[in-house]
Amino acid sequence: PVNEVPDNLNTMRIPVSVKDSLILSIDKSPMDMIYFPEDYPKQKMLTPNLANPVARIIYSRPQINKRIIFADSSVLQNVIQRYGQDWRLGANEATEIEFFKQVTINGRKIAPGRYIMYCIPYPDKWNIVFNENLYSWGLHIDKTKDIAEIEIPVIKNDVEIEYFTMLFQSSIYGCDLVMAWGNAKTVLPIHFN
């Protein structure tokens, strides 16, 4: 026999249109995942026994949305991130990076493993920090678990980038992690050992 839902249960439901429910559930800072090599997921589907990638980053991509991205304390409203304060390099969950082999960044060896990656931005430089305090929503930093802090210069972009973006690019020594948002761009060189 087929179990039917009684009519009185159907009338107790709150009517919500599909459009409204989609709008309510859309994350304004969608999560993204990048790999090095860049096309690793496609390669893995074509070659199941392919070796692990070198690196993977999981992060959320906030948008400017008519706000000021970076500012000092003199700007009082509509600021996403203050200069000199810890930033999770995205939104929502802490940005997570995984190295599948040892790499060297600015002369510092980083062992294979998963880390959160955060930033302390300034107008002319970003300090990128790797930390072992995984699984934190937002950015609840235990600075005793910082394993490396690397200073990289800010390059001014001619084009404004609406969504915070990270991508890997091949280089002669390994790869560069390019991070861009608004008119700011940074490049973190990663050497393969």
Describe the function of each predicted region:
Residues 79-140:
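Mid-length scaffold segments of soluble, non-membrane domains
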Residues 1-85, 139-193:
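Primarily secretory-pathway and cell-envelope proteins
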